[in-house]
Curated annotation (Swiss-Prot):
Protein name: Imidazoleglycerol-phosphate dehydratase
A GO MF label: imidazoleglycerol-phosphate dehydratase activity
Pathway(s) annotated for this protein in UniProt: Amino-acid biosynthesis; L-histidine biosynthesis; L-histidine from 5-phospho-alpha-D-ribose 1-diphosphate: step 6/9
Gene: hisB
Enzyme class: lyase
Principal subcellular localization: cytoplasm
Family: Belongs to the imidazoleglycerol-phosphate dehydratase family.
Organism expressing this protein natively: Geobacillus thermodenitrificans (strain NG80-2)
Record-listed E.C. numbers: 4.2.1.19
InterPro entries: IGPD_sf (IPR038494), ImidazoleglycerolP_deHydtase (IPR000807), ImidazoleglycerP_deHydtase_CS (IPR020565), Ribosomal_Su5_D2-typ_SF (IPR020568)
Matches recorded under NCBIfam families: PRK00951.2-1, PRK00951.2-4, PRK00951.2-5, PRK00951.2-6
Keyword terms of this UniProt record: Amino-acid biosynthesis, Cytoplasm, Histidine biosynthesis, Lyase
Keyword check for rRNA processing: no
Length: 195
């Protein structure tokens, strides 16, 4: 069975169509209206070997907040749906990724208990026109809607772009690891018998 999902979300602020495949080739077709987010999602898909298509229209004439947040919501919902019953998955993923001066770590538990922790400080408030605080908003909504426990640690860095890039690459790699099917796992990887 294909591990993929398509999500549509329309509000007074945004209209989003998103398709996601866990077992992809790292291909991304992205029209987000938020150039820096487009760049980060492209990295996420490439390094996680996911196929991701996003067609988003939002009130970016105000700012990028609603569009960024709502794409995070849709991607989280797509991840949850694509995982199905989670039988046979590894469940946990951990990735360290360096990007020049920056080092980021992302740790994931696909536990069905949403939680988000972020440690790190970005030296700049903006990358181009993108408000850096939206990285937190995107990741928190992603974790909430995917019902994952997501820990993001930016260990160090000087360049904000590099630091965020390391986070999104690590996110892709950690999610890829957590969603891999392990033939040794019988049923769901939990002593509770469900996730």
């Amino acid at each position: 069975m294909a591990r993929e999902a398509t999500i549509a979300r329309t509000t007074n602020e945004t209209s989003i169509q998103l398709s996601f495949s866990l077992d992809g080739e790292g291909k991304a077709e992205l029209e987000t209206g938020v150039p820096f987010l487009t760049h980060m999602l492209d990295l996420f898909a490439k390094h996680g070997q996911f196929d991701l298509r996003v067609d988003a229209k939002g009130d970016t004439h105000i700012d990028d907040h609603h569009t960024t947040e709502d794409i995070g919501i849709c991607l989280g919902q797509a991840i949850k749906e694509a995982l199905g019953d989670k039988k046979g998955i590894k469940r946990y993923g951990n990735a360290f990724v360096p990007m020049d001066d920056a080092l980021a770590q992302v740790v994931i538990d696909l536990s069905n208990r949403p939680h988000f922790e972020f440690r790190g400080e970005f030296p700049a408030a903006k990358v181009g026109t993108f408000d850096v605080e939206l990285v937190y908003e995107f990741l928190w909504k992603l974790a909430l809607e995917a019902r994952m426990n997501l820990h993001v640690i930016v260990h160090y860095g000087r360049n904000t772009h590099h630091m965020i890039e390391a986070v999104f690459k690590a996110l892709g790699r950690a999610l890829d690891e957590a969603t891999m099917v392990d033939p040794r796992v019988k049923g769901v990887p939990s002593t509770k018998g469900m996730l």
